[in-house]
């Protein structure tokens, strides 16, 4: 007769586990409601109701609604900053790596289509983003601007203002992702469709390549 081994009881959730889960629920709820209603339109009451937490949870975990908003944006931006960093550190000429930055943005916005609107709604309203957002954006800007400087040295990128070049490269995928709903109506360009999304990526890569490749008479100056 076989003996059944006693099952080991699952360890109870610790207070830290519960706190981390609550924090994650609040960030997810905040991301949904900030995206739908904007910062001013998303109340703490609505966010905690959406997250299934008590009203004081936002203050406990984030100090304020602004603190939660900063955490939401940081969660969205850190991964794209990491992707850009990986592209910048990859092999190839500066132009090759600049094009990989564009691809990184397209890939991230395909996975997180809400992010451009979430990020830029405060900017469009004339408000200053949270400090952590500015820190991440500065880091990305400096990484891409560094490619411009390297590209001038290796001959793969034409001379130009490094910061303006970085902003131009970033703006292409951000703008397309931001206006995607409008493009479906006036295009008709449906960036949710894989073939159209691929076409948009190839078009943007060609556009950036043409803008950054030095003319023949510039290469040996």
Give residue spans per PLM region.
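Short secondary-structure transition hinges
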Residues: 67, 82, 107-149, 164, ...
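C-terminal peripheral helix-coil segments that are non-catalytic and often amphipathic
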Residues: 1-10, 107, 111, 141-154, ...
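Hydrophobic alpha-helical connector segments
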Residues: 85-117, 154, 162-169, 201, ...
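Short, structured helix-loop boundary elements
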Residues: 23, 44, 66, 70, ...
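Helix-turn-helix
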Residues: 21, 25, 29, 33-67, ...
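Amphipathic alpha-helical linker/stalk segments
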Residues: 70-100, 135, 144-147
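Helical hydrophobic small-molecule/effector-binding pocket
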Residues: 78, 96-121, 130-131, 173-181, ...
């Amino acid at each position: 007769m076989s003996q059944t081994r006693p099952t080991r009881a699952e360890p109870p959730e610790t207070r830290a586990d519960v706190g981390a889960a609550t924090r994650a629920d609040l960030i997810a709820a905040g991301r949904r409601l900030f995206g739908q209603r904007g910062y001013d339109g998303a109340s703490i009451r609505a966010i905690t109701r959406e997250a299934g937490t008590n009203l004081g949870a936002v203050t406990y975990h984030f100090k304020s609604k602004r603190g939660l908003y900063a955490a939401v944006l940081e969660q969205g931006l850190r991964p794209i900053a990491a992707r850009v960093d990986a592209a910048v550190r990859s092999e190839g000429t500066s132009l090759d790596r600049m094009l990989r930055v564009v691809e990184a943005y397209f890939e991230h916005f395909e996975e997180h289509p809400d992010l451009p609107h979430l990020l830029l709604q405060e900017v469009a309203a004339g408000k200053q983003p949270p400090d952590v957002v500015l820190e991440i954006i500065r880091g990305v800007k400096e990484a891409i601007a560094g490619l411009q400087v390297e590209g001038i040295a290796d001959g793969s990128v034409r001379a130009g203002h490094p910061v303006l070049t970085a902003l131009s490269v970033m703006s292409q995928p951000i703008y397309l992702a931001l206006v995607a709903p409008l493009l479906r109506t006036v295009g008709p360009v449906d960036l949710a469709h894989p073939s159209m999304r691929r076409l948009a990526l190839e078009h943007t890569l060609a556009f950036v390549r043409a803008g950054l490749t030095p003319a023949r008479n510039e290469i040996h100056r």
